[in-house]
Amino acid sequence: MQSWSRVYCTLAKRGHFNRIAHGLQGVSAVPLRTYADQPIDADVTVIGSGPGGYVAAIKAAQLGFKTVCIEKNETLGGTCLNVGCIPSKALLNNSHYYHMAHGKDFASRGIEMSEVRLNLEKMMEQKSNAVKALTGGIAHLFKQNKVVRVNGYGKITGKNQVTATKADGSTEVINTKNILIATGSEVTPFPGITIDEDTVVSSTGALSLKKVPEKMVVIGAGVIGVELGSVWQRLGADVTAVELLGHVGGIGIDMEVSKNFQRILQKQGFKFKLNTKVIGATKKSDGNIDVSIEAASGGKAEVITCDVLLVCIGRRPFTQNLGLEELGIELDPRGRIPVNTRFQTKIPNIYAIGDVVAGPMLAHKAEDEGIICVEGMAGGAVHIDYNCVPSVIYTHPEVAWVGKSEEQLKEEGIEYKVGKFPFAANSRAKTNADTDGMVKILGQKSTDRVLGAHIIGPGAGEMINEAALALEYGASCEDIARVCHAHPTLSEAFREANLAASFGKAINF
């Protein structure tokens, strides 16, 4: 549990931020800049309006800083809102409904439908409307918080200067006390394979296909690969994912959960070729694509033919033409911007957060860094425990985890205990006829402290936040087990798993 000294410290910091906010000058009332000869003066200039950038800009303005946010695209929100998290979740949700209606699921619930048809155009329209509403929402929040928005490509042209260049070549200069780089990431290209966003697509193109592929090959069975692959598999495509690693779900996933996840996806019709590498891809005259693969350890090559090839081998930091070289800021071997614990680069008033720095490329991680970074600019404490940052795969069932996996605990030599509870024994999952998966809790053997939580099943993405809170506050498995959970709810499975971890036995299993 949180100590009283930590509570007092937190309250003191809040008071410190309030005093700073009242002491600073008011922010600009101009929500959108047009291009002019007169430079803008700012306290904080944020380059990029993705989850990290726009949240940091709003927080900076709320703390009393005169804040500018530069965005090269017409809409705010970055990759996440425009061609990432948000549109993909719309398609994941709606394709799941279609799959339930088109298969035997609805019939088993007493819902009989004579004909179920897919209107892909309408599904894409709903996705686009969700994106439009949310990106417009950020613009409204900027106006509400008096964040000055500048359209253009931001480049750092001096220690205290950023120049935004518009598509027509016109420029705007911002003289600023602090600069925050939040330019995000871009799709990692596959050597020898050219993405045309038509038949050879990245995650961006996979969100806007004009028709359901007959056969789709996905290079990579990590988070993005299985999410987008499952969308098109549910809508009727024959989908095969080729993965260099020996498991699905990417780095960080617990291996027991990964095996269960693969089994469930295969039961749904998703195919996998693990421990397999892609050698190349060739477009044929009939429009199809031959994908050459072989075992990761080497061996005889095999060819898989598809009409759509989806490349999902990860993302890389986007730092092109930011002016870093001229400032003497060198990137690390993975193309990331080195920063200290306060997110400062080697130039103290130039900061970087999100996908351009080390750590998982997650929207919520970038948001946290953005808030804490600008609080640091205002003189506050800066601390993030990356062990408490959750990860979610938004398939059905969902997969989510936070903290350590069994593999990590074994590698670190930490003695631990395990508590599990299957959704098949959860009353709400039973009534919903959605019982695949389990909750798995890892606790420290000597102290009972929660070290990790791994969930596969309905509502995993929502439930994992309870685990993140427990980790952040240093809760024990018993602490969670003694919290009364509403009945009947899926989250009772989380309590039961903690009962199993702390006392050696769950109640309902």
From Swiss-Prot:
Molecular-function GO terms, alphabetical: dihydrolipoyl dehydrogenase (NADH) activity; flavin adenine dinucleotide binding
Post-translational modification: Tyrosine phosphorylated.
One Gene Ontology CC term in the entry: acrosomal vesicle
Reaction(s) the record says it catalyses: N(6)-[(R)-dihydrolipoyl]-L-lysyl-[protein] + NAD(+) = N(6)-[(R)-lipoyl]-L-lysyl-[protein] + NADH + H(+)
UniProt cross-references to NCBIfam families, sorted A to Z: lipoamide_DH (TIGR01350)
Record text on subunit structure and interactions: Homodimer. Part of the multimeric pyruvate dehydrogenase complex that contains multiple copies of pyruvate dehydrogenase (subunits PDHA (PDHA1 or PDHA2) and PDHB, E1), dihydrolipoamide acetyltransferase (DLAT, E2) and lipoamide dehydrogenase (DLD, E3). These subunits are bound to an inner core composed of about 48 DLAT and 12 PDHX molecules (by non covalent bonds). The 2-oxoglutarate dehydrogenase complex is composed of OGDH (2-oxoglutarate dehydrogenase; E1), DLST (dihydrolipoamide succinyltransferase; E2), DLD (dihydrolipoamide dehydrogenase; E3) and the assembly factor KGD4.
Stated name of the protein: Dihydrolipoyl dehydrogenase, mitochondrial
